[in-house]
């Protein structure tokens, strides 16, 4: 199934687009072939990323290649949608044949439309949305807490140190009591993270940071990710807990990529046997699956990420149907959930119909 999605469907889409480019552009065969070749090479860079080929390139070249490769998949998606709409229009006789063949005005219109969509998407991505959230404990707490929550930073070739620095400044401006990160801090390769010394940026955070692993830490290599978290001063919780003020318990789950991770009920039961005052339980679980199990275990609040809410429409429609909650607040019995669409991004830096965000919560 994954091979079909990653390889076969994109090849079919590129063939479909290439055919339309050949019949639509009023250019010589050489120019048409050159344009198609550029598109194919751009998309090929996406697979170079999976093969870690960028690690052998100069950092600036690797960053540019990553941007081109991961952006191409979104350009491909929108071109397919546009050509499908035009083809459907032709079938029902709403679009004349002349509109589709050797028509430079149509090609220019499509280019301008895509340019507008992606300029908007990039501006929207860079506008990080501050999401306020209320959390209420059924038990008494020593005081009120301000918590900043985030997920899916994906630092690396795509999100370099200068972007991470901007996020650190935004979080520090909130003056939180502590910070929670629900996985995927690292995008993939450790090379840009180490070469740009990104751990130094996390040391600028003015509050303690608690985090869990995401699936992308498994891509980068868990041992290397764990060492980076240690160097960055992040409290990494892998099926273990941290206690704040003898009343708030933060449990970080191993990512479900590890199929042998401990069940949430076992983690809670173990804590109940060791800690008498579990006044409020927070769980960090990167992927928002099996929410019923967190509810049954008596979790007060769970923070997740992973979905990105699809990043762009109409993929957001798919994620909304794949998950019980693909984004935002959700309540199940006495358990409150928040699934973040992420402060960072994987793929092209476009947010279309979704948002990049960080959560500022008040726990009372």
Placement of each model-derived feature along the sequence:
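Hydrophobic alpha-helical transmembrane segments in integral membrane proteins
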Residues: 103, 114-140, 156-162
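Short N-terminal secondary-structure initiator segments
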Residues: 1-6, 124-131, 191-199, 224
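Soluble catalytic domains of enzymes that build or remodel membrane lipids, polysaccharides, and related
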Residues: 136-364
């Amino acid at each position: 199934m994954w091979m079909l999605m990653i390889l076969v469907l994109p090849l079919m889409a590129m063939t479909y687009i290439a055919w339309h480019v050949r019949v639509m552009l009023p250019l010589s065969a050489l120019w048409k072939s050159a344009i198609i070749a550029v598109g194919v090479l751009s998309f090929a860079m996406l697979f170079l990323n999976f093969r870690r080929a960028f690690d052998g390139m100069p950092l600036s070249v690797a960053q540019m290649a990553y941007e081109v490769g991961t952006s191409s998949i979104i350009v491909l998606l929108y071109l397919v949608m546009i050509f499908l709409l035009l083809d459907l229009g032709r079938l029902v006789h709403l679009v004349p044949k002349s509109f589709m063949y050797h028509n430079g005005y149509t090609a220019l219109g499509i280019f301008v439309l895509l340019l507008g969509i992606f300029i908007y998407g990039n501006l929207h991505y860079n506008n990080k949305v501050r999401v306020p959230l209320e959390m209420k404990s059924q038990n008494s707490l020593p005081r009120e807490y301000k918590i900043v929550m985030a997920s899916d930073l994906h630092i690396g070739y795509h999100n370099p140190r200068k972007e991470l620095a901007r996020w650190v400044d935004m979080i520090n401006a909130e003056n939180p009591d502590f910070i929670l990160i629900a996985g995927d801090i690292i995008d993939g390769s450790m090379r840009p993270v180490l070469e740009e010394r990104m751990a130094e940026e996390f040391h600028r955070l003015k509050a303690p940071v608690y985090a869990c692993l995401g699936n992308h830490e498994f891509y980068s290599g868990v041992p290397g990710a764990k060492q980076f978290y240690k160097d960055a001063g992040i409290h990494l919780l892998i099926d273990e807990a941290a206690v704040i003020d003898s009343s708030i318990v933060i449990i970080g789950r191993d990512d479900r990529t590890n199929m042998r991770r401990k069940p949430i009920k076992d983690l809670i039961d173990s804590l109940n046997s060791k800690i008498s005052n579990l006044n409020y339980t927070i769980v960090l679980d990167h992927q928002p699956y099996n929410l019923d199990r967190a509810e049954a275990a008596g979790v007060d609040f769970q923070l997740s990420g992973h979905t990105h809410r699809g990043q762009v429409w109409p993929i957001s429609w798919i994620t909304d149907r794949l998950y019980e909650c693909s984004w935002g607040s959700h309540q199940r019995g006495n358990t409150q959930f928040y699934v973040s669409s992420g402060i960072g991004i994987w793929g092209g830096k476009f947010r279309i119909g979704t948002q990049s965000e960080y959560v500022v919560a008040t726990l009372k």
